[in-house]
Amino acid sequence: MGASAIEFLDDESLRTAQHFENPPYDPKSVENDVTGLLIEYQNDSQNEIDRLIKESKEFSQKESSVISMKLVTDQQDRETIWKIRKGLYPTLGSLRKTGTSIITEDIAVDAENLAQAIRGLKYIFQKHE
């Protein structure tokens, strides 16, 4: 994709935006099992960035699992989105029940197995609440 950063956010992560001022989307409308990709493009050439964005839009239109795509060009909205992402662990940590821990491990999964892996992890977390 030519991205400088790609971050995967599950439904619970996306909902943490409700704890931030003026989120660029409605976190209360995030349904269960919805996920998001935060993709950042950086390049000195605006033409190259435009090309990368066009490719992403074309991909999202072909991919049946993509519900929507929002391009954020406003500097304040971009900063807010990254603030939400960077504040994810502290926010989730502050919301957890007393006596519980937050796990911050990265995992590597083939793209075709990602949805199944996430469902499996959610099942494990719910089972051991």
Where in this protein do the model-derived segments appear?
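Noncatalytic alpha-helical scaffold of FAD-dependent oxidoreductases
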Residues: 1-129
